[in-house]
Amino acid sequence: MANNVTDSSFKKEVLESDLPVLVDFWAEWCGPCKMLTPIIDEISKELKGKVKVLKMNIDENPNIPSEYGIRSIPTIMLFKNGEQKDTKIGLQQKNSLLDWINKSI
């Protein structure tokens, strides 16, 4: 299961991580976000030790999503070595996400 990240823990958990980090930006009211949750949780289990998978509620943590220009959710961002590497917007299929992650890291 993916852990939560907040505005205050983002720097330590994402930018200073030794592992690549996948961040799922979501909100409670977002239907596609809820559909993506089990996919993100499966990816978190499958890539454990290879990629850190985190979730950020944009309503509870508005600063980081604003800083990264997030305008639609779900938005999935991949970070490596403290830098944003790539972004996917909208509901994604598990296999396409895994391919994207593996190509990006």
Curated annotation (Swiss-Prot):
InterPro entries in the cross-refs: Thioredoxin, Thioredoxin-like_sf, Thioredoxin_CS, Thioredoxin_domain
Q: Which cysteines are joined by disulfide bonds?
A: 30-33
Q: Which domain of life is it from?
A: Bacteria
Cellular compartments per GO CC: cytoplasm
MF-aspect GO terms: protein-disulfide reductase activity
**PROSITE patterns in alphabetical order:** THIOREDOXIN_1 (PS00194), THIOREDOXIN_2 (PS51352)
Record's keyword terms, sorted: Disulfide bond, Electron transport, Redox-active center, Transport
Biological role stated in the UniProt entry: Component of the thioredoxin-thioredoxin reductase system. Participates in various redox reactions through the reversible oxidation of its active center dithiol to a disulfide and catalyzes dithiol-disulfide exchange reactions.
Similarity remark: Belongs to the thioredoxin family.
The protein depicted here goes by the name Thioredoxin
Gene designation: trxA
